[in-house]
Regions:
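Extended, composition-driven regions rather than compact fold-specific motifs
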Residues: 1-156
């Protein structure tokens, strides 16, 4: 009789462990193919947030993502640059702002492990890596960015 209860308990623990691992994924118009390949490797039960920056609202498309992941498209053409500057949004700026704001709110307590995959351009990715590692003290081992950017230690 205990076996049935233990089995259910073990299943519940495994289910809870899968649900607790979140993903934070970023991309831009140049990395959409990489994003689609990455999303195809995730299990259907994956959860988390995907931020995609594109030049204009007309560039927004459909991404095949797991059902528990939220996709947010960020059109630079409809956003401003630095507050009060009157400038237009530079490449990577909207992506960095949205990702850092989400991370500040959702990754502040470290209760849920979040795997970070940054596929966007260098400028936005550099700002995000800096914010995650210095402000939020996220371990570099949980962050994946293109090696060509040289933003993370090679021995992580």
């Amino acid at each position: 009789m205990n076996t049935s209860v233990e089995l259910r308990s073990t299943r519940a623990q495994r289910r809870e462990a899968r649900r607790r691992a979140h993903h934070l994924v970023t991309a831009d118009e140049h990395s959409l193919a990489d994003l689609e390949m990455f999303l195809a490797t995730l299990p259907l039960c994956a959860s988390g947030r995907i931020f995609i920056e594109v030049p204009d609202a007309s560039d927004i498309g459909v991404i095949d993502a797991p059902g528990r992941m939220t996709v947010t498209w960020l059109a630079r053409g409809q956003r401003s640059g630095a507050p009060g500057s009157g400038r237009s949004c530079a490449p990577g700026q909207a992506l960095a702002r949205a990702t850092c704001a989400w991370a500040d709110e959702m990754m502040c307590d470290g209760e849920i492990e979040t795997h970070v995959t940054l596929l966007g351009g260098y400028l936005g990715t550099a700002d995000i890596v800096d914010h995650l590692t210095t402000t939020l003290d996220i371990a570099p081992a949980l962050i994946h960015a293109p090696e060509r950017f040289g933003l993370l230690p090679a021995d992580r």
